[in-house]
From Swiss-Prot:
InterPro entries: Helicase_ATP-bd (IPR014001), Helicase_C-like (IPR001650), P-loop_NTPase (IPR027417), SNF2-like_sf (IPR038718), SNF2_N (IPR000330). It comes from African swine fever virus (isolate Pig/Kenya/KEN-50/1950). A motif (DEAH box) lies at residues 168-171. Residues 378-599 form the Helicase C-terminal domain. One of its GO terms (molecular function) is RNA helicase activity. One of its GO terms (cellular component) is virion component. It comes from the Viruses. Residues 62-227 form the Helicase ATP-binding domain. Putative DNA-dependent ATPase required for providing the needed energy to achieve the termination of early transcripts. This is Termination factor NPH-I homolog.
């Protein structure tokens, strides 16, 4: 069986196929079959096995032949996208060369996930690490954030021809492409290489597609289809598919037709949601700046406004280059607001930096007097909330030196101890540095050594640690293992983990009870990414039901009211930068969320999962879309809604096959005929244009039934 995605019959064909795969999955779950397929059925969740089978089945066609070249794996964060991609890499490695592209900090995540998968596949093995080495030799790793990514790809396989390309955190690639001013960037070079590659299979892994702008869909689906499926220019894309008046999708039906067959979505199913901890409603703490803090904030805003006016002419012309966002969109991530946003977190005149002194050193020397409700009301408010947490706590800030490091210094002053992984130990050790009775103690093999457990837990010190982009992957893994230790269920080992954007990516954490986001961002998907570090499938299984909850907090700095009303009317900024970022984020989130809903409706599992609004057409075998998107918009929609009804009809046999018919004077030549379609396991109407139609009429009129 094979099916082509640009066909009205594809949606019903894929639904029927997945139903068959699911029945096979249930059988293999209970069997003692030792084949590789059976082992994967027992190792994978059902939603993973559906995609594993559809993608690896040489007869079906997902990602091969006349079909597209791969899938956007849009699975809710924490549902095992890495395990799914590694399963396909193992199964297809004899045909395609697996190349895994991810930020450098996440490479070890793949190794850990691969070891986990090997243990699931081969529970009888006594040495999974040996099998890990054997399988790992088939894979090539490339750093998405490396300056020489192109050279790494050449070294990994010479080219992308004949490879299985797996891109983790793929939304970063999509953003990188549309933020590129030219073809010289890593992201744009990778896009061009993928578009030119032959015999390539692709898996884009992300839990947050369309997080910055719907235009991210363009490079994504052009690469998956291997052709210009969506318009390259921002203005053309928005004219075709975005209603700017209502801030919602336009021509959604035509866009769905083009996307079907390239998306896998998992995340809304009730049975899956039961496996996640409960995310409690977001608590937004609007923290009024102190008079001194607000004074510094206003000075910073004056400087930022002056810089903005000085460069105002630089972005007036709309950037119409292919695969580029207009210049006005690039402003959101600019440096214009960095000063004021950092002051919104911490403002102390005690933070003075000499020419020969690094900022981090200056932060480390801050005295207790520097941390008051005058200098850091946000941090003071956050710590009050943290003290109410019954378990581990995650803190996020975009800013490292004047965000996370300032918080870390405040925690030290408050009596918390910084837990630091040691860099000099042999690979495989879980080592920490802790302070007890005035001495520094090196603790090795934490995960295995019982006396070490006693030593750590008896110290009765509340610990915190940091993961930023500068930390080594081995140290990062060590911290994650310590956090996820059964001994850390209530934060006994690590109570607080501070993470940056880069540091947070790929973390898989258990037991977390609170998430604190220190400043809003105009991209709400980033906040979702942070929360998803501890809101994951099975992350709270070890906790009793009443403790399987996560409370998120967001901190927004607002104006000092007394000073605000003392400013002459007309000179006031009605909203702080924090407030503007938050509101902008909600506005953008509305549009991006609407496009993500379209992706869910076009997902190959949509109808199988019983979701509403799925793209389901009458299987007429007509083309689902015209290759030219502008002409496609002018043509009638070939996808006529599929309506399943029961009709009363007569049975006849013709040339050994059974057909049904109705006498209907208002249709065709007075008859409606139906034939059985084994792919969708239902009867479909035979069109009058089909030569079989006339033969069946003659057959009926002749009065024969054989």
């Amino acid at each position: 069986m094979s099916c082509v995605h640009n066909n009205t019959s594809f949606p019903v064909q894929i639904e029927a196929y997945l139903k068959e795969v699911f029945e096979k999955y249930k059988e293999l779950q209970e069997s003692k079959d030792t084949s590789l397929t059976a082992r994967f059925a027992r190792a994978l969740k059902y939603y993973q096995f559906l995609i594993y089978t559809a993608f690896s089945d040489p007869k079906f066609g997902i990602g091969q032949g006349e079909n597209t070249r791969g899938l956007l794996i849009y699975h809710q964060m924490g549902m095992g996208k890495t395990i799914l991609s590694l399963s396909l890499a193992i199964s297809l490695s004899h045909i395609y060369n697996p190349i895994l592209i991810a930020p450098k900090s996440l490479h070890s995540n793949f190794q850990q996930s691969l070891l986990k998968l090997i243990k699931l596949l081969y529970p009888e093995t006594t040495d999974p690490s040996k099998e890990l080495q054997k399988i790992s030799r088939r894979f090539r790793f490339v750093s998405l954030d490396a300056y020489n990514m192109g050279q790494q790809i050449i070294k990994a396989g010479g080219s992308l021809n004949g490879c299985l390309l797996i891109v983790d955190e793929a939304h970063n690639l999509f953003r990188g492409i549309i933020n590129s001013a030219n073809d010289k960037t890593n992201a744009r070079q990778l896009y061009n290489n993928i578009m030119q590659a032959k015999n390539i299979r692709i898996l884009f892994l992300t839990g947050t597609p369309c997080s910055k702008d719907p235009f991210e869909m363009v490079p994504c689906f052009n690469m998956l289809s291997g052709r210009i499926l969506l318009p390259l220019h921002y203005e053309r894309f928005y004219t075709a598919y975005v209603n700017k008046t209502t801030n919602s999708p336009l021509n959604a039906d035509k866009l769905l037709n083009r996307l079907v067959g390239m998306i896998s979505y998992a995340g809304n199913q009730n049975e899956l949601n039961k496996l996640f901890p409960t995310e409690l409603p977001l608590i937004i703490e609007k923290v009024e700046m102190s008079p001194e803090q607000y004074r510094q904030y206003l000075l910073a805003r004056d400087v930022e406004n002056a810089e903005k006016h000085a460069s105002s002419g630089m972005h007036e012309k709309i950037n119409t280059a292919a695969l580029c966002l207009p210049g006005s969109e690039q402003e959101s991530g600019s440096s214009y607001y960095v000063r004021s946003r950092m002051i919104s977190i911490f403002a102390s005149e005690m933070l003075t930096i000499k020419e020969d002194e690094k900022l981090s050193e200056a932060v480390q020397q801050l005295p207790k007097e520097a941390f008051t409700e005058t200098s850091s009301p946000k941090i003071v408010c956050m710590l009050k909330n943290i003290k109410t947490s019954p378990g581990p706590v995650l803190i996020y800030s975009q800013f490292v030196e004047l965000g996370l490091h300032v918080v870390a210094r405040f925690l030290e002053i408050e009596g918390y101890q910084c837990l630091q992984p040691l860099k000099v130990l042999e690979e495989g050790h879980n080592a920490i540095l802790l302070h007890k009775d005035g001495k520094d103690l090196m603790v090795k093999n934490f995960a295995e050594d019982e006396p070490t457990h006693t030593l750590v837990l008896s110290s009765k010190i509340t610990r915190f640690t940091l993961i930023t982009g500068k930390i080594l992957s081995k140290e990062r893994d060590m911290i994650q293992q310590l956090w996820n230790s059964p001994l850390n269920i209530h934060g006994e080992v690590i109570k607080i983990l501070l993470v940056s954007k880069t540091g947070a990516e790929g973390l898989d954490l258990k037991y977390g009870r609170q998430v604190h986001i220190l400043e809003p961002y105009w991209d709400k998907a980033r906040e979702d990414q942070v929360k998803a570090r501890i809101i994951r499938i099975g992350s709270h299984d070890a906790l009793p039901p009443e403790e399987k909850t996560v409370q998120p907090f967001l901190y927004i700095a607002v104006a000092n009211q007394k000073m605000f009303y003392s400013i002459p009317e007309g000179s006031q900024e009605q909203k702080t930068i924090d407030e503007r970022f938050h509101e902008r984020g909600l506005e953008k989130s509305h549009l991006n969320s609407a496009f993500r809903d379209l992706l869910k409706r076009a997902a190959i599992e949509c109808a199988f999962n019983g979701e509403s609004g799925c793209l389901m057409c009458q299987p007429t075998n007509a083309l689902l879309f015209h290759e030219n998107f502008e002409r496609d918009l002018r043509l009638p929609n070939p996808c006529q809604p599929l309506v399943k009804t029961e009709v009363k009809a007569y049975s006849i046999s013709y040339e050994g096959k059974q057909f049904f018919y109705q006498k209907n004077k208002g249709v065709g030549l007075g008859y409606t005929f139906y034939e059985y379609n084994p792919i969708i396991k239902a009867y479909i109407e035979i069109k009058p244009s089909n030569p079989l139609y006339i033969k069946l009429i003659k057959h009926v009129q002749a009065g024969t039934t054989v």
